[in-house]
Amino acid sequence: PVKFWGDDDGQKYHKAYFTRFENIWHHGDFIERTNKNGFIMRGRSDATLNPGGVRIGTSEIYQQVEDINFITEALVVGQDFDDDVRIILFVTTKNNQEINDEKSKLIKSRIRKNCSPKHVPAIIIKVPEIPRTKSGKIVELAVKQIINGEKINNKEAIANPEALKFFEKLSQLKL
Protein backbone atom coordinates (compact mmCIF):
# COMPACT_ATOMS: atom_id res chain seq x y z
CA PRO A 1 0.00 0.00 0.00
CA VAL A 2 1.01 3.61 -0.47
CA LYS A 3 -0.69 4.82 2.72
CA PHE A 4 -3.01 3.75 5.55
CA TRP A 5 -6.56 4.98 5.90
CA GLY A 6 -6.74 7.65 8.62
CA ASP A 7 -2.95 7.94 8.90
CA ASP A 8 -2.73 11.52 7.66
CA ASP A 9 0.81 12.16 8.89
CA GLY A 10 2.11 8.75 7.71
CA GLN A 11 3.48 7.67 11.11
CA LYS A 12 1.67 4.29 11.20
CA TYR A 13 2.68 3.56 7.61
CA HIS A 14 6.32 4.39 8.34
CA LYS A 15 6.28 2.27 11.52
CA ALA A 16 4.83 -0.71 9.64
CA TYR A 17 7.23 -0.71 6.69
CA PHE A 18 10.33 1.41 7.34
CA THR A 19 11.48 0.79 10.93
CA ARG A 20 13.23 -2.56 10.42
CA PHE A 21 15.80 -1.27 7.90
CA GLU A 22 16.68 2.40 7.41
CA ASN A 23 15.33 3.78 4.11
CA ILE A 24 14.32 0.29 2.92
CA TRP A 25 10.72 -0.81 2.57
CA HIS A 26 10.22 -4.11 4.45
CA HIS A 27 6.88 -5.86 3.99
CA GLY A 28 7.59 -9.20 5.68
CA ASP A 29 7.32 -11.55 2.69
CA PHE A 30 10.19 -13.78 1.65
CA ILE A 31 10.89 -13.57 -2.08
CA GLU A 32 13.40 -15.22 -4.34
CA ARG A 33 14.86 -13.47 -7.37
CA THR A 34 15.15 -15.70 -10.43
CA ASN A 35 18.01 -15.62 -12.94
CA LYS A 36 15.63 -13.88 -15.39
CA ASN A 37 14.97 -11.06 -12.88
CA GLY A 38 11.55 -12.36 -11.93
CA PHE A 39 10.44 -12.90 -8.36
CA ILE A 40 8.86 -15.89 -6.62
CA MET A 41 6.81 -15.18 -3.49
CA ARG A 42 7.75 -17.82 -0.90
CA GLY A 43 5.53 -16.65 1.96
CA ARG A 44 5.90 -14.65 5.14
CA SER A 45 9.50 -14.20 6.21
CA ASP A 46 8.44 -13.92 9.84
CA ALA A 47 6.70 -17.30 9.42
CA THR A 48 9.94 -19.01 8.37
CA LEU A 49 12.06 -20.96 10.82
CA ASN A 50 15.73 -21.60 10.16
CA PRO A 51 17.14 -24.27 12.51
CA GLY A 52 20.59 -25.41 11.43
CA GLY A 53 20.31 -23.37 8.25
CA VAL A 54 17.28 -25.33 7.00
CA ARG A 55 14.40 -23.05 5.96
CA ILE A 56 11.08 -24.37 7.29
CA GLY A 57 7.68 -22.78 6.79
CA THR A 58 5.56 -22.79 9.94
CA SER A 59 2.65 -24.16 7.91
CA GLU A 60 4.58 -27.43 7.51
CA ILE A 61 4.41 -27.92 11.28
CA TYR A 62 0.83 -26.68 11.58
CA GLN A 63 -0.29 -29.29 9.03
CA GLN A 64 1.07 -32.03 11.28
CA VAL A 65 -0.49 -30.90 14.56
CA GLU A 66 -3.84 -29.48 13.46
CA ASP A 67 -5.64 -32.82 13.30
CA ILE A 68 -4.17 -34.36 16.46
CA ASN A 69 -7.31 -35.03 18.46
CA PHE A 70 -6.29 -33.29 21.71
CA ILE A 71 -4.93 -30.10 20.10
CA THR A 72 -7.28 -27.21 19.31
CA GLU A 73 -4.75 -24.63 18.09
CA ALA A 74 -1.02 -24.25 17.64
CA LEU A 75 1.53 -21.49 17.26
CA VAL A 76 5.14 -22.18 16.30
CA VAL A 77 8.10 -19.79 16.42
CA GLY A 78 11.87 -19.88 16.40
CA GLN A 79 13.94 -18.81 19.38
CA ASP A 80 17.57 -17.78 19.00
CA PHE A 81 19.50 -20.31 21.08
CA ASP A 82 23.16 -21.42 21.21
CA ASP A 83 24.10 -19.67 17.93
CA ASP A 84 21.19 -21.39 16.17
CA VAL A 85 17.40 -21.42 16.23
CA ARG A 86 15.30 -23.83 18.24
CA ILE A 87 11.67 -24.47 17.38
CA ILE A 88 9.11 -23.78 20.11
CA LEU A 89 5.58 -25.13 19.66
CA PHE A 90 2.74 -23.64 21.71
CA VAL A 91 -0.60 -25.44 21.79
CA THR A 92 -4.06 -25.09 23.25
CA THR A 93 -5.82 -28.34 24.09
CA LYS A 94 -9.33 -29.76 24.17
CA ASN A 95 -10.81 -29.74 27.66
CA ASN A 96 -7.62 -28.08 28.93
CA GLN A 97 -5.65 -31.35 28.76
CA GLU A 98 -2.04 -31.29 29.90
CA ILE A 99 0.79 -32.05 27.48
CA ASN A 100 2.47 -34.97 29.22
CA ASP A 101 5.49 -36.93 27.96
CA GLU A 102 3.31 -39.35 25.99
CA LYS A 103 1.50 -36.55 24.14
CA SER A 104 4.73 -34.65 23.55
CA LYS A 105 6.34 -37.79 22.08
CA LEU A 106 3.31 -38.34 19.83
CA ILE A 107 3.52 -34.78 18.49
CA LYS A 108 7.27 -34.96 17.91
CA SER A 109 7.07 -38.41 16.31
CA ARG A 110 4.40 -37.31 13.87
CA ILE A 111 6.37 -34.21 12.85
CA ARG A 112 9.61 -36.22 12.47
CA LYS A 113 7.88 -38.94 10.40
CA ASN A 114 5.95 -36.60 8.07
CA CYS A 115 8.50 -33.77 7.81
CA SER A 116 12.06 -34.20 9.08
CA PRO A 117 14.08 -34.25 12.30
CA LYS A 118 14.85 -30.53 11.77
CA HIS A 119 11.10 -29.77 12.00
CA VAL A 120 10.75 -31.29 15.48
CA PRO A 121 10.16 -28.70 18.21
CA ALA A 122 12.74 -28.51 20.98
CA ILE A 123 10.00 -27.53 23.44
CA ILE A 124 6.22 -27.95 23.43
CA ILE A 125 4.26 -25.72 25.81
CA LYS A 126 0.55 -25.68 26.54
CA VAL A 127 -0.83 -22.13 26.58
CA PRO A 128 -4.21 -20.81 27.71
CA GLU A 129 -4.76 -18.73 24.58
CA ILE A 130 -3.19 -18.02 21.19
CA PRO A 131 -2.80 -14.30 20.40
CA ARG A 132 -4.54 -13.12 17.21
CA THR A 133 -4.76 -10.03 15.07
CA LYS A 134 -8.03 -8.13 14.83
CA SER A 135 -8.61 -9.94 11.53
CA GLY A 136 -8.24 -13.33 13.27
CA LYS A 137 -4.74 -14.35 12.16
CA ILE A 138 -2.37 -16.05 14.59
CA VAL A 139 0.29 -13.62 15.86
CA GLU A 140 3.61 -15.42 15.45
CA LEU A 141 5.81 -12.35 15.24
CA ALA A 142 4.87 -10.81 18.62
CA VAL A 143 5.42 -14.15 20.38
CA LYS A 144 8.75 -14.59 18.60
CA GLN A 145 9.77 -11.08 19.68
CA ILE A 146 8.83 -11.80 23.30
CA ILE A 147 10.73 -15.08 23.59
CA ASN A 148 13.77 -13.53 21.93
CA GLY A 149 13.77 -10.59 24.37
CA GLU A 150 12.81 -8.04 21.72
CA LYS A 151 10.35 -5.16 21.79
CA ILE A 152 6.91 -5.98 20.40
CA ASN A 153 5.97 -4.03 17.29
CA ASN A 154 2.35 -3.27 16.40
CA LYS A 155 0.82 -4.39 19.71
CA GLU A 156 -2.23 -2.27 18.87
CA ALA A 157 -3.05 -4.67 15.99
CA ILE A 158 -3.56 -7.58 18.42
CA ALA A 159 -7.17 -8.38 19.28
CA ASN A 160 -6.31 -10.10 22.58
CA PRO A 161 -3.07 -8.48 23.82
CA GLU A 162 -3.66 -9.93 27.29
CA ALA A 163 -2.74 -13.34 25.80
CA LEU A 164 0.84 -12.09 25.43
CA LYS A 165 1.29 -11.87 29.22
CA PHE A 166 1.58 -15.66 29.46
CA PHE A 167 4.48 -15.67 26.99
CA GLU A 168 6.22 -12.80 28.82
CA LYS A 169 6.22 -14.86 32.04
CA LEU A 170 7.61 -18.12 30.59
CA SER A 171 10.71 -18.70 32.70
CA GLN A 172 11.82 -21.81 30.77
CA LEU A 173 12.35 -19.69 27.64
CA LYS A 174 14.33 -16.87 29.26
CA LEU A 175 17.68 -16.42 27.54
Language-model features: where?
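Short Gly/aromatic-enriched secondary-structure transition segments
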Residues: 7-9
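Hydrophobic/anchoring residues in structured secondary elements
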Residues: 76, 125-126
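Flexible lysine-rich "adenylation lid" loop at the C-terminal edge of ANL adenylation domains
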Residues: 127-152
